Amino acid sequence: MKKLLLFITGISILFLAGCSNGNQSHGNEGMGDSLPADPPLGYVIELKPLGKFSHQEAEQLREELVKQLGIILYTKPKAWVEASVFVGDKREIPASCLYKPRNRYWAGGILKMLHEEHGGNDEIVTIGLTHRDISTSIHGQYNYGIMGLSFRPGDACVVSTFRLKRKDDLWKVTIHEFLHSRGLPHCKKDDLKCLMQDAHSKNTFYMKHGLCEDCKNSLRMIMAHQER
């Protein structure tokens, strides 16, 4: 896999309107934070429970991600996808990330922590999972509440359940941010049913079920380029 840039070229964000701004891994028993010697996809996806996000919840998300990524990455053997997603050890969000006036955690600070945890290893994409409210500053608004944030391209994402209306939306937001980390931008067609549509300050994930044809083609080109 072609090495990812050490300097992050962009950050992708999901917004929501109405804001100022013990156990073992399923399929990877005892893996913890260790990595497969030769990741079949060229990288692995680590789901990192943060704070009160439980290991069990992360395992449930993992099962859904394996299923959905198997559809999105349909050219890859299912066993490759199964072997490439694991639940890592729980971490606490650093107190330095807390913005006390709104009781929100700066998403950028969480990304920095996740990026540094593996020393910038571009063979692992770490997705932090939290129930806490997260935020960033964008469009002239300071500390704007968001659902997710990722480096694009990069090795870290963070997703929050705080603004999600349905449990089923979690895998959708997670895949949205993960695909940003692979370099996929927002849907250029602005297709309401596409997982990569910009949220436009609204939570419309209940309407989304997959990628539009344009985003599928863009992802194929990105993956082909990274595999050279």
Show the residue positions of the predicted features:
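Metzincin-family zinc-dependent endopeptidase catalytic domain
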Residues: H55, E59, E63-V173, P185
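Sec-dependent N-terminal signal peptides
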Residues: L6-I11
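C-terminal motif of bacterial Sec signal peptides marking the signal peptidase cleavage site
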Residues: L16-G18
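Positively charged n-region of N-terminal signal peptides that target proteins for export
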Residues: M1-L4
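Metalloprotease/metallohydrolase-associated module, dominated by Zn2+-dependent proteases
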Residues: Y142-D169, P185-R228
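Active-site-flanking alpha-helical
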Residues: L179, G183-L184
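Bacterial signal peptide processing site
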Residues: S20-G22
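Fold-level signature of zinc-dependent metallopeptidase catalytic domains
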Residues: D38-E57
